[in-house]
UniProtKB/Swiss-Prot annotation:
It is an enzyme of class 1 (oxidoreductase). The active site is at H155, K159. Its main location: cytoplasm. CDD domains: DHDPR_N. Its EC number is 1.17.1.8. One of its GO terms (biological process) is lysine biosynthetic process via diaminopimelate. It is found in: Cytoplasm. Keywords: Amino-acid biosynthesis, Cytoplasm, Diaminopimelate biosynthesis, Lysine biosynthesis, NAD, NADP, Oxidoreductase. Pfam families: DapB_C (PF05173), DapB_N (PF01113). Belongs to the DapB family. It catalyses: (S)-2,3,4,5-tetrahydrodipicolinate + NAD(+) + H2O = (2S,4S)-4-hydroxy-2,3,4,5-tetrahydrodipicolinate + NADH + H(+); (S)-2,3,4,5-tetrahydrodipicolinate + NADP(+) + H2O = (2S,4S)-4-hydroxy-2,3,4,5-tetrahydrodipicolinate + NADPH + H(+). SUPFAM superfamilies: Glyceraldehyde-3-phosphate dehydrogenase-like, C-terminal domain (SSF55347), NAD(P)-binding Rossmann-fold domains (SSF51735). It comes from Bacillus cereus (strain ZK / E33L). This is 4-hydroxy-tetrahydrodipicolinate reductase. The gene is dapB. The lineage of its organism: Bacteria, Bacillati, Bacillota, Bacilli, Bacillales.
Length: 266
């Protein structure tokens, strides 16, 4: 396969560290630079626990793109920074794979239009774990037969957004096969605000944040005399790398924005 030159934004994070290791062990990936506001002017090999890669680190993406030629930006930063990075990348015609979440429908619409206008491939993935993507697809299928459903998502206590992008995407897919309806007793009352979780078109999402967790989600469907549970667990961040690899390879052949890995796997 032809070499793909990659810039990683957010190499110091846990996902970023795994992505750097992915670059090292994948023959056709070439890490040409990284973006980290705390370590501009250093090299990847200067960071604790990193492999001996000489890719330079830039304090900001704008300067990096002025000095480095790349094929793909892999952004694994925070939601706010990720939004800025993908906008800059798309406007400059650089393909990007975005692993941050928190995009609104309006923001996705704007990015989709810009990507189409620039004919630049972009993938925004709420979850890179292939198993999690299958969980979402299975949940979408089940919703045709089970109209009553609730989602419980569980993540580490350092996660910034709630509910997770995976939970939101799961509900979006379920809604495609489910008529809008309110679940539970029509006169139910929350004795404590938020007790029933977030409500999206009658589907409740419950967010759990605890140390020791990585990324987990349970989709519970209830029916007369039966229950169906679809669950996925990521026990470490290596579970996300197969999806990162697939996304980087796939975005090279796209000329538009794709939201969600379920749209690029067969």
């Amino acid at each position: 396969m032809k070499e793909i030159k990659v810039i990683i934004a957010g190499p110091r994070g846990r996902m970023g560290h795994e992505a750097v290791l992915l670059m090292e062990r994948t023959e056709h990936f070439n890490l040409v630079a990284a973006v980290d506001y705390k370590h501009g002017g250093e090299k990847i090999s200067d960071l604790p626990g990193m492999p001996a890669l000489d890719a330079p680190i830039y304090a900001d993406l704008h300067t990096c793109l002025e000095e480095v030629e790349a094929d793909v930006l892999l952004d694994l930063t925070t939601p706010e920074v990720g939004k800025q990075h993908v906008t800059l990348a798309v406007e400059r015609g650089l393909r990007s794979v975005i692993g941050t979440t928190g995009f609104t429908e309006e923001e996705l619409k704007q990015l989709t239009e810009i990507a189409k206008e620039k004919a630049v491939g972009t993938i925004i993935a709420p979850n890179f774990a292939i198993g999690a993507v299958l969980m979402m697809k299975f949940s979408q299928m089940a919703a045709k037969y089970f109209q009553d459903v609730e989602v419980i998502e569980l993540h580490h206590d350092q996660k910034l957004d709630a509910p997770s992008g995976t939970a939101v995407k799961t509900v979006e897919l379920i809604r495609q096969n489910r008529e809008s309806k309110q679940q539970g007793h029509p006169n139910e009352v929350e004795q404590l605000e938020g007790a029933r979780g977030a409500n999206v078109d009658g589907i409740h999402i419950h967010s759990v944040r605890l140390p020791g967790l990585i990324a987990h989600q349970e989709v519970m469907f209830g029916g007369d005399g039966q229950m169906l549970t679809v669950r996925h667990d990521s026990f470490n961040r290596a579970s996300f790398m197969s999806g990162v690899k697939l996304s980087i390879e796939t975005v090279m052949n796209l000329d538009h924005l794709v939201y969600g890995l379920e749209n690029i796997i067969d």
